[in-house]
Structure formats: C-alpha cells, structure tokens
Amino acid sequence: MHSKNNTILKMIKGEEVTHTPVWFMRQAGRSQPEYRALKEKYSLFEITHQPELCAYVTHLPVDNYQTDAAILYKDIMTPLKPIGVDVEIKSGIGPVISNTIKTVQDVEKLGQIDPKRDVPYVLDTIKLLTEEKLNVPLIGFVGAPFTLASYMIEGGPSKNYHFTKAMMFRDEATWFALMDHLVDMSITYASAQIEAGAELIQIFDSWIGALNAVDFNYYIKPSMERLIKGIKAQHDVPIILFGVNATHLIEEWNNLPIDVLGIDWRTTIKETSDSGVAKTIQGNLDPSLLLAPWDVIQPRLDKILDEGMQHGKHIFNLGHGVFPEVNPDTLKQITAYVHDYTKRK
C-alpha cells in the first residue's frame, strides 16, 4: 500500500513538497470516455444519487491523470432542493428554478437542511471514497451565497444579474435574510462533508464578478466571513475560494480568512502575488487552451509554473472548468508535465 499523497495539503501549510500539486475543476465526468459510457446507461440524477457510481466518477481522474486531489462529483445546487427550492438541471442551460425568491416571505418559507436526512447519498459517496482508500485528499464544496442567491432570484443563469442586484439595492431586508439562510445551510452542508471525510472545501463563487468592490464589501463580505469562520469553527480544514471574473476583488478576498485564493485566467499569478497575496494561489490556465496544440500550451504552462514557484505556494489548476470536448490525454499530459517541471531538487 502506497502512502497517501498529501502534497496539496502540505503546499497549503507551507511544508516541503516534491512538486506543485495539480487538480482540475470539473475533472470528474464530462470529458472522460468512461463517464460518457456511464451516461449511456444512467441519468445524471442516477449517477449523482448512487454512491457507488458517484464515487467511481470522482475517483476516475485520480487514476487516469494522477491528479493530486479528487473533487466530489456533485453540483452546487445539491443542497437547495431539500430546503424547498424547485431546481432542475436542464441540458444546455444549467440550473433552472421555478419558485424564485421575490420577498422576505419567500425566504421564510425555506427549510433547514439536515444532510444525513436530505442528502445521505452525498455523505455515503464521501465515506465510500474514504473506505476505498482514495490516495489523495478529497475536496468537498459549496456554492457561495451570492452565486446561489443569484440563481434563486433570477431563476437560472443570467448575463447581467439585474434582478439580483435590484433586490440587493432596494430590499435589503430580503437580501440579508436570504444571505443568512444560505450561509447557515452552507456551513451545515460543508461540515457534513468534512465529517464524512472531505479534507478541503472549495467555495465556488461563479458570478461574483458582477459586483464592484464597494458593493461586495457591503452586501456580501459579512456573509462570506460568517460562512468561512462558521466552517472553520467546527473543522480545521483548508478553504479555497474561487470566483470568475473577480480580479478586481482580489484585495477584498485576500482579507477573508481563506487559505487558498483561486484565480481565473484574466490575471496572472505574478500580478496576484505582487498585489500583496501571501496565501496559496490556485490556477490559472485558460481552459480554452486545452483545445490547442501542445506547442501552444507548453509556454503558457511554463509561465504559470515559474510564477507559482516564485510565489512559493501554488496549486496548479485551470481558470475555470474542463470542457466536455477536451481530450483526456491532454489533462494527463499536463499533470505529468507540471509534476516534472516543478520537481523540487
């Protein structure tokens, strides 16, 4: 039995490592032929609700690509249905919600989550992976309050988040009631994942880039602080915060009690480091480059890895998720290249 590869945890703690750790957002499913074969037999609902299937999909990229972490194959919407949100994942669209939040009474109708009762299949998947002696740390995750709220108010993905921002600006009572409810839910859900065996938590804030720094500080930051501190009060595990198009919020994020700051491809690790970030930085290859030839990918990798080693604490990842069209061999090649290029002498 090989000893466990804890490189990602060591990197975050500032301990000595043999190489820069690698994992990919959306590494589980989508681009993998084994997953596509599974989808011919089972629906997405069946895969996510059957722990054996879900654990298999979660484990695949660790076996196939040799990544330094696994991320649970779930969706950020998972805890919403149990609290009374009528959400469906529609192909080609994403999450669609029919009972949108419009008033404080709508928020008051939402229930509380009990993970053991409401999402036992999530916890059973994590336990199964732990029992199978997954050789790398497992990342659990939650959606950030703003991103979850935007889905619940808009009814689905949005280009401008007009309804979400309008509620923020004109109905603070409803807005902060919704924030509080989502923070409570996410603390409970994240804690249950950790108790089942997750060793890190990533907070996905996909749509936070819609806000400027002033509005983030007033309408969002207190909720984010309460979420992060709430998880850490119960469990001493590293927390990664990742957002899209949020370069202008790096200073605000750096002041949050997170351990890892995840960046997209719109900035650089050097710029992030130079702005005063001393935490571990995660990122940040443009996922579109995965469709490019290797001679285009390699110099971009070199730059990211050089800047990461200069910064000192770096987890290699993409600037967003893996596309379904990506060749799995490319991910395998990148992982091997990162491990080799960053091998500590």
Swiss-Prot record:
Q: Which PANTHER family match?
A: METHYLTETRAHYDROFOLATE:HOMOCYSTEINE METHYLTRANSFERASE RELATED, UROPORPHYRINOGEN DECARBOXYLASE
Pathway(s) where this gene product acts: Porphyrin-containing compound metabolism; protoporphyrin-IX biosynthesis; coproporphyrinogen-III from 5-aminolevulinate: step 4/4
Organism taxonomic ancestry = Bacteria, Bacillati, Bacillota, Bacilli, Bacillales
Functional note: Catalyzes the decarboxylation of four acetate groups of uroporphyrinogen-III to yield coproporphyrinogen-III.
Assembly, per entry: Homodimer.
Gene from which this protein is expressed:
hemE
Q: Which CDD domains match?
A: URO-D
**GO CC, alphabetical:** cytosol
State the name under which the record lists this protein.
Uroporphyrinogen decarboxylase
- Pfam families, alphabetically? URO-D
